[in-house]
Every structure is written in structure tokens, then in C-alpha cells.
């Protein structure tokens, strides 16, 4: 089936996810029907345990639906092999988490370039892209600094630079401001939106931060694994 300009980036049809629990199966997501368009900025909100992070993991090919269909453009993500999922993540997805997971013994630019080098990219190319990404997040003056000398907000910005290094089509962020103070979190949240607009990448954010959610173009609210509400400002 050919992709057309109107094809959604993501299409979920009756998507559910369950895990084996003690003595019974634990249902986390219950039959989600949803589309996400290329270039959107989307917040996923809801109480703890509502399925937000599970949904993000499905969108990032970190997990597979138990039932239903999940398509990226016209590709069935549920039918991907583990190798295909890994290639898909490397090519299409950038991940940002609450904790930056930067390696303290390396410089900022080394941390940002490292995964590309491990994947086989020549050092010069990887470092060039890393410097460009760090410039995008306002860290051009901190390139050679050890990450231990960076503030919390700067470390999260370095993690964002790492996520956008290869210009993925989608940026998935799980509580990206959850470990930051209010002012720093606002700076990081607005930076994510700036990158969404400037680079044209789809931004999907799981957050408990109401102010951050309200900045997004659309807010999806999950309750007990179901899509309870969709809201556009």
C-alpha cells in the first residue's frame, strides 16, 4: 500500500497491552484508537499507572501491542522482528527520559556523539553532528566540558542533543522535566517545542507537568488504560 500525503504518522486501531501478573494478566492499555500526524506536538497525560509510559514504549518500538494494530505510516510495527525494531529506533526515533543517563567520565560532545560512533559512524562525522546538535540546544560553549560540571538543566539539554543527533522523525520524551525545578523545566519544555517547529520532527511527551502539556498542540488524557479525552488548546 502506497503512502499518501494524508497518511498519519502513527495509526492505532484497538491497541491493547497486557503483562503477566501474579496469578492473572495485568491489562495496561485497553483498545486505543488514535492517529498522530507528522509534525504534531502531543502531550500524554494521566494519573500514575494509567498507561502513559507503556503507550510511549509502543510508539518507540520498545514493546509490542498484545492486540490491535499499530502502524508507523503504512508499516505494521507489531510485525517487526527484533532486528527491524532496533533499526527502526535508530533511524526514526529519538528518546529523552527523566534522567539523562550521561556518562560522567566523558565530555559533553563525547556523550552526544558516542552512540553514533558505536553504530559505526566515522568519528569526525559523529563529532560534527554532535557539535551541531549541542548548538541547537544552546550548549555550544560547553562542548568540551565534563558533564559533571553541567547544571541539571544543561545535562538534560545535552541529552536532548543526543536524541536529535541523527535528525529522527519522532522525538519521544518521558517526563523530560520531572527532575528539574520549575524554571529550568519551563526552559527545557519550550526548547523541545522549538525543536519540534524548527526541525519538523513529531514531538510526543509524557508529562505530569500541566504547564508543559498546555504548550503542546494536542493533549491526550489516559484513564485506567483508556483514551479518556483529547484536547487542542
Swiss-Prot record:
Alphabetized SUPFAM superfamilies for the sequence: P-loop containing nucleoside triphosphate hydrolases
Q: Does the keyword Cytoplasm apply?
A: no
According to its record, how does it sit in the membrane? Peripheral membrane protein
GO MF terms here are: ATP binding; ATP hydrolysis activity; transmembrane transporter activity
* One term under GO cellular component: plasma membrane
* Leading EC class: translocase
Occurrences of domain ABC transporter (ranges): 10-233
Q: Which keywords accompany this UniProt record?
A: ATP-binding, Cell inner membrane, Cell membrane, Membrane, Nucleotide-binding, Translocase, Transport
InterPro entries to which the protein is assigned, alphabetical: AAA+_ATPase (IPR003593), ABC_transporter-like_ATP-bd (IPR003439), ABC_transporter-like_CS (IPR017871), ABC_transpr_LolD-like (IPR015854), MacB-like_ATP-bd (IPR017911), P-loop_NTPase (IPR027417)
Source organism's superkingdom? Bacteria
The record's Gene Ontology biological-process terms are:
lipoprotein localization to outer membrane; protein localization to outer membrane
Which E.C. number(s) belong to this protein?
A: 7.6.2.-
Location in or out of the cell: Cell inner membrane
Q: Tell me which residues bind ATP.
A: 46-53
Q: Which family does it belong to?
A: Belongs to the ABC transporter superfamily. Lipoprotein translocase (TC 3.A.1.125) family.
Its job: Part of the ABC transporter complex LolCDE involved in the translocation of mature outer membrane-directed lipoproteins, from the inner membrane to the periplasmic chaperone, LolA. Responsible for the formation of the LolA-lipoprotein complex in an ATP-dependent manner.
Subunit arrangement? The complex is composed of two ATP-binding proteins (LolD) and two transmembrane proteins (LolC and LolE).
Entry protein name: Lipoprotein-releasing system ATP-binding protein LolD
From what organism does this protein derive? Nitratidesulfovibrio vulgaris (strain ATCC 29579 / DSM 644 / CCUG 34227 / NCIMB 8303 / VKM B-1760 / Hildenborough) (Desulfovibrio vulgaris)
Amino acid at each position: 500500500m502506497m503512502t499518501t500525503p494524508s497518511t498519519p504518522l502513527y495509526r492505532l486501531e484497538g491497541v491493547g497491552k497486557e503483562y503477566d501478573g501474579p496469578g492473572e494478566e495485568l491489562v495496561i492499555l485497553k483498545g486505543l484508537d488514535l492517529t498522530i500526524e507528522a509534525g504534531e506536538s502531543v502531550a500524554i497525560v494521566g494519573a500514575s499507572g494509567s498507561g502513559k509510559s507503556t503507550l510511549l514504549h509502543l510508539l518507540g518500538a520498545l514493546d509490542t501491542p498484545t492486540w490491535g494494530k499499530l502502524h508507523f505510516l503504512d508499516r505494521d510495527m507489531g510485525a517487526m522482528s527484533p532486528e527491524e525494531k532496533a533499526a527502526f529506533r535508530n533511524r526514526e526515533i529519538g528518546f529523552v527520559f527523566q534522567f539523562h543517563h550521561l556518562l560522567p567520565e566523558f565530555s559533553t560532545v563525547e556523550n552526544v556523539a558516542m552512540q553514533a560512533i558505536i553504530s559505526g559512524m566515522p568519528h569526525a562525522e559523529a563529532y560534527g553532528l554532535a557539535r551541531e546538535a549541542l548548538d541547537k540546544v544552546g550548549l555550544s560553549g560547553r562542548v568540551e566540558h565534563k558533564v559533571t560540571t553541567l547544571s541539571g538543566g544543561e545535562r538534560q539539554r545535552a541529552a536532548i542533543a543526543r536524541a536529535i543527533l541523527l535528525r529522527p522523525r519522532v522525538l519521544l520524551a518521558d517526563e523530560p522535566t520531572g527532575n528539574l525545578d520549575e524554571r529550568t523545566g519551563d526552559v527545557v519544555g519550550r526548547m523541545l517545542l522549538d525543536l519540534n517547529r524548527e526541525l519538523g520532527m513529531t514531538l510526543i511527551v509524557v508529562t505530569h507537568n500541566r504547564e508543559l502539556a498546555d504548550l503542546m498542540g494536542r493533549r491526550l488524557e489516559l484513564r485506567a488504560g483508556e483514551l479518556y479525552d483529547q484536547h487542542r488548546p
